[in-house]
Amino acid sequence: MGGRFRDRDWPWIQLGQGDAAHPGAYGASMRSMKAILVSFVALVIEHSQAARAEQPVAPMWQLAEAPFQLEVTVLSMEEKPLTERITNIWHRVKVKRVFVGSGLSVGDELAVVSQVFDNPPGATSSSGDRGPFNGPNGLPAKGDHARIFANGSAKVLKTISPNGWQLPDQMIAFIATDDEYRSDVTMPFIAKLIARQGIARTSVHFSTGDDGRGSSAKEPDMKARTGLTDDLGLRRADSSVLAMRRSELGYNQMNSFASVTRHGLPIVGFRNSLQAFGFPGDGEGTKWWNDAFPVETWGTRWRSQCGRQSKTRIVAPDAEARRHPVLSGVSIPAEGLVVPSSLFRVDPLPPDCRVLLWGEAVDGDCPEAERRQPILWVRELPRKSGLPPQRIAFTSLGHPADFLDSEVRLLSIQMIAWAIGEEARMDDAARLTIRTAQYLPPEVQPPATVKP
């Protein structure tokens, strides 16, 4: 099931998500339905083999697609041996924050069961590894604060030790597949600044190829389009930053991508993420990810640019825009700020998008009426079950030389901090650190590594 998506694979992934935004999936052709049945039979065989190999539960990277992501306080813990090598560990927890999930509110108490195996560290089963806490098998103890990624119901959740339990600070997944604008250089730089300011933990996932067995290769390859380094790690993130360009991710990789981008979690985009995917073919799923995903997420799509050699003048924001946390403390002179990014032309934004910065083409070849375009905007989309709105921020800036400017660096960090609700961390000291951070442009930067 690895490799690049084919058209017939798409209805399967859409039906699996159960997303009403994809009505085309429910009118799939007979060819697509046949592929679904074939995939289903393959999954049954796969799971039967796993059962015979005494794999009692699915690995956490599958459960991470389930509908619960919570921040909790542990009230109690109890170990209950199930077999000679399997122990159920029951936690009683109190909900502090609901990121994803229905039927739960802040203050609710519920049970969480985790299975611990006596596998040695590094065994094939993920449960043989240790979690980040000091309890049994790295699980949290009484009084600990933790994040839960779990399946189950609003009364009893089930997860797998230790991957379903994470430290309470947020994790942002940076997805860097834009080879044209060297996201392998710019995104690690931004991710480091985010982590150093204590805004969130970060991971960077680079473009790579397929290992030939349906999984991503381990080493970055920015010319490849079908894989992401540590793509399963996306499922442990609770927000994402995209710097993508025309990716053609495989089936497993798209499952991971959807887990962090299709559940109302915060999402931030740079530059070519207006055209994040470039799947071949004209199937319903192909069209949705290529064309509808950017519109549904960012509110618009890429149309063209005002000349590849042109630049953009960032227009000084008005007083109302300056009061937004994304632009707090950002200094754009009255005459504007010229940056190397060419100006992108986009379709008109919907009313729920709030433009914070406009740009004007410098030495561009756009028609006069289109030489002024939005270059940074935010939106908040409502969510069900009383959850806070999804925060989304996008900028068409992102040329690697843009980040030589301290104000572009600052607004980039503040976009992310606002999206995940951590804008209060951006004080004057933090802004000074970001402005004075050393940035190496691509021409002197070493190649991307898995751990930037």
Positions of predicted regions on the chain:
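Solvent-exposed loop/turn segments at secondary-structure junctions
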Residues: 79-80, 98-101, 116-120, 153-155, ...
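Extracellular ligand-binding/catalytic regions of CAZymes and related secreted enzymes
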Residues: 164-165, 169-171, 176, 196, ...
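Bacterial N-terminal signal peptides
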Residues: 35-47
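Transition segments tied to proteolytic processing and entry into folded domains
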Residues: 49-169
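Tryptophan (W) side chains
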Residues: 10-12
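An acidic, glycine-rich "communication" segment
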Residues: 187, 270-366, 428-452
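Helical hinge/lid and interdomain linker segments adjacent to catalytic or ligand-binding clefts
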Residues: 173-175, 179-277
